[in-house]
Amino acid sequence: MDILWHVIYFLATSKFLTLFIAFLALPVVIGLSVWKGRLAKYYAVIPVLAFLNLFFGTDVAAYAMHSFGEKGSATITGSYDTSTVYNNHNVVGYHVLLKTADGKVVETSFEDDDFNIYPPKNSVVYPGIGDHFTVYYLRWFPKDFVIVDNDDSPWATGLRCGRLRNDVQEANAKYEFDRGNAGYRSDYIALINKLLSEKCVDDNDEVDAFRHDIENIEAGQP
């Protein structure tokens, strides 16, 4: 089964190569369709799938890897330049050390146009050098993997807490602008409580300051 997912992963992360091969094979497909007319609709699916792979291939690969892969851990050890440009962006590659479930360490890499993040999303944030994160990989092809950004790994936790802090800052700005707005007050309090419950604040003084803010808001004090 790993071989099938390996092929799917390769095709999904080689979108333009897949499309190029499909169009090269188009004359063959047309010829087969003429020769075997009753099977034409099946042959026609090939270029259609290659086109759809441009938009949904990485999502399918991410879900497949997470569903059928094994859980491991990884860290980024360095980056490198590539000669690829994607959407006016110079693609950057990253060197990775991946530790499998049985403790084996594998050297691998990925590029930031692979979109190998689970759950899939339109805009992705990748770990930096030295970050530790969770991956799902194929047992027989451990160099095929996706990065998990919504679990409790150190990197994913930092990412989640960073987003929460941004939300708290935005809610605070709204509340400070219009303190009489009940919606702004409740949103600000809810986000502070979420920030604290997610254990995103380590400093006891900062925790006390947030709780003091909540008490003041609920008491109607400035």
Predicted regions and their residues:
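Membrane-interface helix-boundary motifs at transmembrane edges
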Residues: 33-42
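Oxidizing extracytosolic/periplasmic lumen-facing domains
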Residues: 2-28, 48-222
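Hydrophobic core segments of alpha-helical transmembrane domains in multi-pass membrane proteins
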Residues: 43-47
